[in-house]
Amino acid sequence: MSMVYINIFLAFTLSFMGLLIYRSHLMSSLLCLEGMMLSLFVLMTVTILSNHFTLASMAPIILLVFAACEAALGLSLLVMVSNTYGTDYVQNLNLLQC
């Protein structure tokens, strides 16, 4: 396993650990999700380029499209929650708390 793959795996792991640790605020959770998507994009791109997979060359672009959609939905949810409650706590998203 080369150092590039180890660094990408470490970036994904740190983003995932940040998602688990800083899950009280929605903005920090969204940033950790974006870090995870970025490391997956770099991992897919490096793997495709190093193994010369020409048929799978669109996969990183498709992942970026899904990451952009996820970011847009997350930011719209963040704006809605912050306008409604005044904070960006994830606990405000509980539907059982009418």
From Swiss-Prot:
Name the reaction it catalyses.
a ubiquinone + NADH + 5 H(+)(in) = a ubiquinol + NAD(+) + 4 H(+)(out)
Instruction: Enumerate the subcellular locations listed in this protein's record, separating them with semicolons.
Output: Mitochondrion inner membrane
> What GO CC terms are in its UniProt record?
mitochondrial inner membrane; respiratory chain complex I
EC no. given is 7.1.1.2
Give one Pfam family, short name only.
Oxidored_q2
The way this protein sits in the membrane is described as: Multi-pass membrane protein
Function recorded in the entry = Core subunit of the mitochondrial membrane respiratory chain NADH dehydrogenase (Complex I) which catalyzes electron transfer from NADH through the respiratory chain, using ubiquinone as an electron acceptor. Part of the enzyme membrane arm which is embedded in the lipid bilayer and involved in proton translocation.
Q: What is this protein called?
A: NADH-ubiquinone oxidoreductase chain 4L
Source organism per entry reads: Taxidea taxus
